[in-house]
UniProtKB/Swiss-Prot annotation:
It comes from Mus musculus (Mouse). The gene is Dcaf6. This is DDB1- and CUL4-associated factor 6. The modification Phosphoserine is found at S336, S665, S673, S863, S866. Interacts with the nuclear receptors NR3C1 and AR in the presence of ligand. Interacts with DDB1, CUL4A and CUL4B. Residues 499-510 have a biased composition (Low complexity). Residues 692-721 form the IQ domain.
């Protein structure tokens, strides 16, 4: 090897290291910086230690062992050299493990891990399983994405999650916390989902946080504190020293899937979902002088992307080394049998969304959306695409396409309640978190379908025009989202006016995985249960109270406008779904998704137009009483009727009855209070009536958005650095999973996993592509280099951990193959941006619906014909 000149003295240097004559780090830096060394990498070992996708891997400080976590909810400590498992730990997690770390300086005996249900476990491998199960933190609302330990600190660790908070825990203070709605350990409230964190190695008080608004925020932890320590700042801008965002993503919502500091702390590597990898210097400030986009430019960039194609859930044909772009498959005649059907469905959805977009444009600025045409049922209902407030950074656009109720009815009518089959279990349990792009664990990947009791009535048009209690018809709501772990999502809901399943009591917030976006928490459009037991509450009881669906619809909308709250999904007992004069109700938006009334809220918040609505509603008390009797979900009414609600609820309750100045003052006081609102998925409120949960969630969301808007305004006045992009690394594809890691390897290389099943390695300084390794049958998610030796560990959707080392005798980098893979990835990344993943139940429902519509038309034609014959007979 020395004779070839590629790595002179390598054997002698390795010999010196084994004899302890040279520092291992010197050998690592000397040879790891050479591209010929990188291009000799070869698969050395495969560790089959899990029964599910391996979502996190971590070397211990000495590089002897690997800690891994998986969909099988187990933690495993293995020896990659002997290929043996040291310890298998039943973690106590009930959902997919996303991140696990050894606590430093604990002799690898203490582990911290987090999972998709938001629970963090503090595990001591020397303690029994029952004791370890007691050491859990349930503080996060929604998914917890990552755990980060502090160098040389065995007692503290940080976490980030979907609720937009970064939390700091000290095991000397407590080793568990199951307090409901706990805010004691919040270090930073980002107002947007915090999906990744990183600590600067040489200066560990610098903390980088990646958020769902495409931003990377760097904080000085010395300026921060928690409520537990008594010095919580309560502002998302406190301690912020830099904020990075690529210019072309400033008005988009690409989630950060990975953050990584360089060893010297001088650069940060950030990987974006549905985009590329960027390198920036946190001390740079040259982007400050760039022009800030106007509100009109933001509005234009947030427009709905085209919907070109559908993908069935579980279809992983676009991942792995053998994946091909659609154009190439068409050219080679390799179309799958279901392509024709999927394409026809895609064309149909495209037409719906185009029509919805047109109506959304015409409805923008109106009080609420109105139905198209004068038919007895709305064909398409939409939400406007953007708010006008320039200070509120909006993650995404959304629209609800509500198909006629007939689309969900079976081909034969029935007067008996029919239980619609749920397409996913996401509503019932957080176990099925879809952040991991694993075929086995993707029950909620991009589309949610919730089943409810659907009372299928006869096809009498008079009944449809005049709905009454107990005769509500289900509505198919297609919620198109441009934010999530995929680039686009459709949410499918089967809802009924007067009934819902018991599962809705736990899951009014659900995870939507979008292949190519962030994972988003989406409350189903109409799954809130009525006050009390949703199964035993009879429709007749509600009808006796004299509240008509039409009145409820109008009151709900007026209330949403009056109180300036973000719109919340109406209770399944509200009558809006069956009111032919109204479109389907707007759902409480996921992060960044704004419904019609929510957009009005954003547009009017700066001027407090809600006070004007309040002063023009003298009939409010009577409406309140009627709606409360019907157990609907007006936030203001329920907060005023429930004195046991949290302080924010108490603060907002009397505002509707006060004069405008008092209302403004109260809102301002509440907004500046210490009760810091966080991003709360509706499913978090597991106790108490459904209407109470929704009321609290709406108020929390309202104040969270207010605080976020104010903090974004403050950013322009603060001395916060705004770095420019230093280098961009392309060629890989990051669109199907939320845990795609990018990492530094030594001082000269950058690497990342990819949806094509390869490991990509670039030159750090030139972005030249240097190496391509086939490492998974579907997706490579995790890459962790050995702390000293030139060894790399990788994992992904395959149920194993792969160990790579420079064993090839000569360079094996195939430039031609790499160029082909890069070209395909670029094409498929663009395809993924316009692809929506739907469950099989969605396709079956659509086919049944179209068949039912066709049958209805034929029946209608026959009825018209018989009617004409009868008229002729009467004339005779």
């Amino acid at each position: 090897m020395a004779r070839s000149g590629s790595c002179p003295h390598l054997l002698w240097d390795v010999r010196k290291r084994s004899l302890g004559l040279e520092d291992p780090s010197r050998l690592r830096s000397r040879y790891l910086g050479r591209r010929e060394f990188i291009q000799r990498l070869k698969l050395e070992a495969t560790l089959n230690v899990h029964d599910g996708c391996v979502n996190t891997i971590c070397w211990n400080d000495t590089g002897e062992y690997i800690l891994s976590g998986s969909d099988d909810t187990k933690l495993v400590i293995s020896n990659p050299y002997s290929r043996k498992v040291l310890t298998t730990i039943r973690s106590g997690h009930r959902a997919n493990i996303f991140s696990a770390k050894f606590l430093p300086c604990t002799d690898d005996k203490q582990i911290v891990s987090c999972s998709g249900d938001g629970v963090i476990f503090y595990t001591n491998i020397e303690q029994d399983a029952e004791t370890n199960r007691q050491c859990q933190f349930t503080c996060h609302y929604g998914t917890t994405y990552e755990i980060m330990t502090v160098p040389n600190d065995p007692y503290t660790f940080l976490s980030c999650g979907e609720d937009g908070t970064v939390r700091w825990f000290d095991t000397r203070i407590k080793t568990s916390c199951t307090k409901e709605d706990c805010k004691d350990d919040i270090l930073i409230n980002c107002r947007r989902a915090a999906t990744s964190v990183a600590i600067c190695p040489p200066v560990p008080y610098y903390l980088a946080v990646g958020c769902s608004d495409s931003s990377v925020r760097i904080y000085d932890r010395r300026m921060l504190g928690t409520r537990a320590t008594g010095n919580y700042a309560g502002r998302g801008t406190t301690g912020m020293v830099a904020r990075f965002i690529p210019s072309h993503l400033s008005n988009k919502s690409c989630r950060v899937t990975s953050l990584c500091y360089s060893e010297d702390g001088q650069e940060i590597l950030v990987s974006y979902s549905s985009d590329y990898i960027y390198l920036f210097d946190p001390k740079d400030d040259t982007a400050r002088e760039l022009k800030t986009p106007s509100a009109e430019e933001r509005r234009e960039e947030l427009r709905q992307p085209p919907v070109k194609r559908l993908r069935l859930r579980g279809d992983w044909s676009d991942t792995g080394p053998r994946a091909r772009p659609e154009s190439e498959r068409e050219r080679d005649g390799e179309q799958s049998p279901n392509v024709s059907l999927m394409q026809r469905m895609s064309d149909m959805l495209s037409r719906w969304f185009e029509e919805a977009s047109e109506v959304a444009q015409s409805n923008r600025g109106r009080g609420r959306p109105r139905p198209r045409g004068g038919t007895n049922q709305p064909d398409v209902s939409t939400l406007p695409t953007v708010p006008s407030s320039p200070n509120l950074e909006v993650c995404e656009t959304a629209m609800d396409v509500d198909m006629p109720a007939a689309l969900l009815q079976p081909s034969t009518s029935s007067t008996d309640p029919v239980q619609a089959q749920a397409a996913t279990a996401a509503i019932e349990s957080p176990r099925s978190s879809s952040l991991l792009s694993c075929p086995d664990s993707e029950p909620r990947q991009s589309v949610e379908a919730s089943g409810h009791h659907a009372h299928h009535q006869s096809d009498n048009s008079n009944e449809r025009l005049s709905p009454k209690p107990g005769t509500g018809e289900p509505v198919l709501s297609l919620h198109y989202s441009t934010e999530g772990t995929t680039t686009s999502t459709i949410k499918l809901n089967f809802t009924d006016e007067w009934s819902s399943t018991a599962s809705s009591s736990r899951g009014n917030g659900s995870h939507c995985k979008s292949e190519g976006q962030e994972e988003c928490l989406v409350p189903p459009s109409s799954v809130q249960p009525p006050e009390g037991d949703s199964e035993t509450r009879a429709p007749e009881e509600l009808s006796e109270k004299g509240t008509l669906p039409e009145n409820l619809t109008q009151n709900q909308i007026d209330t949403a406008q009056l109180d300036n709250f973000p719109a919340e999904p109406l209770d399944s007992n509200s009558g809006e779904k069956n009111n032919p004069s109204q479109d389907s109700p707007c759902g409480l938006p996921e992060e960044g998704t704004l419904s019609e009334t929510d957009r009005e809220t954003c547009e009017q918040a700066s001027t407090e137009s809600a006070t004007r609505h309040a002063s023009t509603k003298p009939e409010l008390p009577s409406q309140t009483e009627a709606i409360e009797q019907a157990s609907t979900e007006s936030a203001t009414r329920h907060t005023s009727a429930n004195p046991e609600l949290p302080s924010q609820t108490e603060a907002i309750a009397p505002l509707a009855h006060e004069d405008p100045s008092a209302r403004d003052s109260a809102l301002q006081d509440t907004d500046d209070s210490d009760d810091d609102p966080v991003l709360i998925p509706g499913a978090r409120y597991r106790t108490g009536p459904g209407d109470r949960r929704s009321a609290v969630a709406r108020i929390q969301e309202f104040f969270r958005r207010r605080k976020e808007r104010k903090e974004m305004e403050e950013l322009d006045t603060l001395n916060i650095r705004r770095p420019l992009v230093k280098m961009v690394y392309k060629g890989h594809r990051n669109s199907r999973t939320m845990i795609k890691e990018a990492n530094f390897w030594g001082a000269n290389f950058v690497m990342s996993g990819s949806d094509c099943g390869h490991i990509f390695i670039w030159d750090r300084h030139t972005a030249e592509h240097l190496m391509l390794l086939e490492a998974d049958n579907h997706v490579v998610n995790c890459l962790q280099p050995h702390p000293f030796d030139p060894i790399l560990a990788s994992s992904g959707i395959d149920y194993d951990i792969k160990i790579w080392s420079p064993l090839e005798e000569s360079r094996i980098f195939n430039r031609k193959l790499a160029d082909e893979v890069i070209t395909r990835n670029e094409l498929m990344l663009e395809e993924t941006r316009n692809t929506i993943t739907v469950p099989a139940s969605f396709m079956l429902r659509m086919l049944a619906s179209l068949n039912h519509i066709r049958a209805d038309r034929l029946e209608g034609d026959r009825s018209e014909g018989s009617g004409q014959e009868n008229e002729n007979e009467d004339e005779e």
